[in-house]
């Protein structure tokens, strides 16, 4: 997903927390646009969508992009060595994933990160005082799990990660939460933690579905009318 006008804020966010030479995984790298935030020698983009990986490799040939399997069980593994990376970058990713799967991913991230490594993340978030943005995000975004900062934080804590909030960027109807997460050896695991879809999502889902698929229905209808007039 792409949110307009977030570019400068993202460059500033990463520029303050990444140094050349640190090994980076861009998890859910999409079409590769965020690769430019990092040095090609430091970067691996991981993505489940084969066509997006192919497009990324065409657009950014100096960078490394790989197709990865879905993580659905505790036995599934990402194709990355233990304790091998300094940073895992998550940009507009987690809100597409239910909390059960997020927790499985966090365990994998814990395995992959070096000691002292960190997760740098950007996610749309619900802010109680920002009702208009909360509605707009859920109307136009395909992600079903836009939750609050507190819920994101609790989800990370349930897998022994501490959260350091960095900033909230407000742009084009979105509240984009920037944060850093680090593993805490003193933390505890809560296997029973989970989050649900918010009421915002439940009420706006029909509108979102119409906006996502309605244009194709309209296009088919227009083509049908044109063909009917031609023949």
Region roles according to the model:
Residues 21-30:
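Conserved class I S-adenosyl-L-methionine
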Residues 30-76:
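Class I SAM-dependent methyltransferase SAM/SAH-binding core
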Residues 225-231:
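Juxtamembrane boundary at the C-terminal end of a transmembrane helix
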Residues 103-115:
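A short glycine-rich, Lys/Arg-flanked "PGG" loop and its adjoining helix->strand segment in the class I
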Residues 121-159, 163-178:
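C-terminal alpha-helical "lid/dimerization" subdomain adjacent to the S-adenosyl-L-methionine
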Residues 89:
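A conserved beta-strand element that flanks and buttresses the S-adenosyl-L-methionine
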């Amino acid at each position: 997903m792409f949110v307009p006008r977030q570019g400068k804020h993202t460059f500033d966010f990463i520029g303050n927390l990444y140094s050349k030479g640190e090994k980076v995984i861009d998890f859910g790298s999409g079409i590769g646009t965020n690769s430019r935030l990092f040095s090609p020698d430091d970067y691996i983009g991981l993505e489940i969508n084969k066509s997006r990986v192919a497009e990324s490799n065409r657009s950014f040939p100096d960078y490394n992009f790989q197709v990865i399997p879905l993580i659905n069980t505790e036995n599934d593994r990402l194709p990355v060595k233990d304790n091998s990376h300094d940073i895992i970058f998550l940009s507009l990713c987690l809100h597409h994933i239910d909390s059960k799967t997020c927790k499985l991913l966090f365990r994998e991230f814990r395995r992959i990160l070096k000691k002292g490594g960190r997760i740098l993340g950007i996610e749309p978030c619900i802010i109680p005082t920002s009702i208009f943005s909360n509605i707009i995000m859920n109307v136009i975004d395909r992600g079903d799990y836009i939750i609050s900062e507190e819920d994101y934080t609790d989800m990370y804590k349930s897998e022994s990660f501490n959260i350091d909030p960095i900033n909230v960027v407000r742009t084009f109807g979105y509240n984009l939460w920037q944060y850093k997460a680090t593993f805490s050896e003193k933390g505890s695991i809560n296997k029973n933690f989970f989050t649900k879809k918010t009421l915002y999502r439940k009420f706006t889902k029909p509108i979102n579905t119409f906006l996502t698929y309605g244009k194709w229905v309209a296009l088919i209808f227009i083509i049908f009318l044109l063909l009917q007039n031609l023949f």
